[in-house]
Each structure stands twice: as C-alpha cells, then as structure tokens.
Amino acid sequence: MLLVIDVGNTNTVLGVYHDGKLEYHWRIETSRHKTEDEFGMILRSLFDHSGLMFEQIDGIIISSVVPPIMFALERMCTKYFHIEPQIVGPGMKTGLNIKYDNPKEVGADRIVNAVAAIHLYGNPLIVVDFGTATTYCYIDENKQYMGGAIAPGITISTEALYSRAAKLPRIEITRPDNIIGKNTVSAMQSGILFGYVGQVEGIVKRMKWQAKQEPKVIATGGLAPLIANESDCIDIVDPFLTLKGLELIYERNRVGSV
C-alpha cells in the first residue's frame, strides 16, 4: 500500500492507495509545530479507525508547500513506517516541461495537479485549485507547463473582510438565496461567492485568449464544487486530483521504473 501526503498551508490531506485505487483518505489541520511523534499518533489513530496497520504501507510520497513541517514528517515516516519517503521536488520524474522563468519556484502542489490532470483528462488544460491561495495553471498541447496565476483564496479574503471591517461578521461561505442581498450576511455571501465566480471566469477567459486555445478547465480543492455550480467555465471537478498526482509521480520514480 502507498501512503500519499499533501501538505497545504491550511490543511494536510492524506490517502492510502492499494493496487492503484484510493481506498482511504483523511484531512487534518496543518500544524507547523507538531513533532514526528505527534504526527505518528495522529496517523496511528486514523489507521486504527480504518482497520489499517503501519506494516501494510510499503511506500510514502509527500508534497508540501510548508517547508518547516517537512523535517518532522520525514522523521515520522522513518520512525513509524521505517520508510524513506519520496519528496516532490526538483529532480523527480514528472513528465512535465516547466516553462517558468525559474522552474524551482513552481509549488509542489501545482506540479502534482498538472501531472494528474494531463494523465486523466488530456491537454491543453487549465487547472484551478481552490486552496489557501487560488492557483491557475496552464498546460499547453505539448504537455508544457506554461505558467499561471495566483490569487488570494476565498477563505483568506473572507477572513480579511471580517478582520478589517469592524461591523462585518464572520460568515459561512455558502450560496445566498439572492444575488441582491437583503441583509449584511447575505450581501457578504453574495459578494464573496459571485465575486470569485467572476474572478475564475475572467482569468480563464483571458488565459484562453492569450493561448489562442480552448483547453479543458479542471477544478479541485474544497470549494471547487461551490464555484463550479455557479459557472459554466469549469468542465470537471476532481476533489482528489492532488492525491492522484502523487500516486502517479510515485510510480514514475520507484526504484526500477523506466
């Protein structure tokens, strides 16, 4: 079995693959201060609840956009699983030709998403990931990672509105009954949700115009279904795109793989 770990700024998503199929998945809060033993105990609890044993895991791969957490995670893997994990980064086989000015600047999550999207949905593609930041990645017809855009995530923007405007409350990010809000909460929900729908549609439209192509648009991340329900510009929502990409990259970099 393969353990895949995707460390984001807000949440860490973990999954277990067996024979190429995602059998289990969990989401925990990302903490920069946990030790390898604390991570080990969290994994022990998740595994016990799912009827799994550490000894069943024979491979681990990690992608992370939070460097301070990596030392503890790597120590956890070697101490509790007795496995040296693969770490997504420069030098790994991905099949991507990255056309960024400095390819090392491209986040591991964006690379992993691109690998999965190409494999599953073909190319050209735009991949939109609704995470702590909302990222847009353009992959052309030759599987070249051409670049993209990075915007503040929906949750960040919502929290900024609450924390910087004294009379505005903290709200749930959900669809309001009306676009024209009749109270403060519904007005904020309308502005946040439909403002982001407009952002997605605007950036996707401009990327297509610049590339002079009609790529598929793949969305992932916790709020992807909410946005996709309000916009025709998103073709496919894949909530496990990153975990699928990690499994693919692991297989391409196994000892003995071609």
Curated annotation (Swiss-Prot):
Record note on cofactor: Monovalent cations. Ammonium or potassium.
Cofactor(s) this protein requires: NH4(+); K(+)
GO molecular function annotations of the record: ATP binding; metal ion binding; pantothenate kinase activity
Pfam families: Pan_kinase
Regulation: Not regulated by feedback inhibition by CoA and its thioesters as described for many other pantothenate kinases. Not inhibited by N-pentylpantothenamide (N5-Pan), and this compound cannot act as a substrate either.
Pathway named in the protein's UniProt entry: Cofactor biosynthesis; coenzyme A biosynthesis; CoA from (R)-pantothenate: step 1/5
Gene3D superfamilies named in the record: 3.30.420.40
Keywords: ATP-binding, Coenzyme A biosynthesis, Cytoplasm, Kinase, Metal-binding, Nucleotide-binding, Potassium, Transferase
Catalysed reaction equations from the record: (R)-pantothenate + ATP = (R)-4'-phosphopantothenate + ADP + H(+)
Residues reported in the UniProt entry to bind K(+): 129
GO CC terms, sorted: cytoplasm
Catalytic residues as annotated in Swiss-Prot or TrEMBL: 109 (proton acceptor)
Assigned EC number: 2.7.1.33
Residue positions binding substrate: 100, 107-110, 184
Any one biological process term the GO annotation gives: coenzyme A biosynthetic process
Enzyme class per UniProt: transferase
InterPro entries: ATPase_NBD, Type_III_PanK
Subcellular location: Cytoplasm
Subunit composition and interactions: Homodimer.
Function: Catalyzes the phosphorylation of pantothenate (Pan), the first step in CoA biosynthesis. Cannot utilize a phosphoryl donor other than ATP.
Record NCBIfam families: baf, PRK13318.1-1, PRK13318.1-5, PRK13318.1-6, PRK13321.1
Family in the record: Belongs to the type III pantothenate kinase family.
Designated name of the protein: Type III pantothenate kinase
